[in-house]
Amino acid sequence: MKTRTQQIEALQQEWTQSRWEGIRRPYSAEEVVKLRGSVNPECTLAQLGAAKIWRLLNGESKKGYVNSLGALTGGQALQQAKAGIEAVYLSGWQVAADANLAASMYPDQSLYPANSVPAVVERINNTYRRADQIQWSSGIEPGDP
């Protein structure tokens, strides 16, 4: 676990990255760390996904743009990734119509349960994690063809 000073320094360093260029904060890194508490849960999948889409949108895309397809299931998302699709899109209207936790069809007006989209994201992430476990146990490194 990092000390308070290490956390402050790490956050200050993070804020110097180009991703945060132009962002004005009326608070200091010290104030943020003070409010966090000593235990900071990590959201690894969210952090990895955010970093990947940031890199793609800022020049790492193979084609100079980022194409995407909608996926409603983990199987669809996994097949898209295997086919080379760089990003997966989860549509709110699709969740409203087909995958909300109330098991009913709704218009895309956020009338469905608020945890429906996070539940679909969790299922997609679980599929990706399982595929990663299978590849890793076979000796395949991330990014290998």
Regions found by a protein language model. Name each.
Residues 94, 104-145:
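Active-site beta->alpha loop and helix N-cap motifs at the rims of alpha/beta catalytic domains
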Residues 4, 46, 50, 73, ...:
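Generic structural signal for well-ordered, non-membrane alpha-helical segments
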Residues 4-70, 81, 136-145:
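N-terminal amphipathic alpha-helix/helix-capping segment at the start of soluble metabolic enzymes
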Residues 72-94:
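Catalytic domains of carbohydrate-active enzymes, especially glycoside hydrolases
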Residues 64-67, 85-88, 122-125:
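Structural motif
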Residues 60-63, 102-107:
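Glycine/charged-rich beta-loop-alpha catalytic/anionic-binding loops adjacent to active sites
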Residues 96-100:
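Short acidic/His/Gly/Ser-rich catalytic and metal-binding motifs that mark active-site loops
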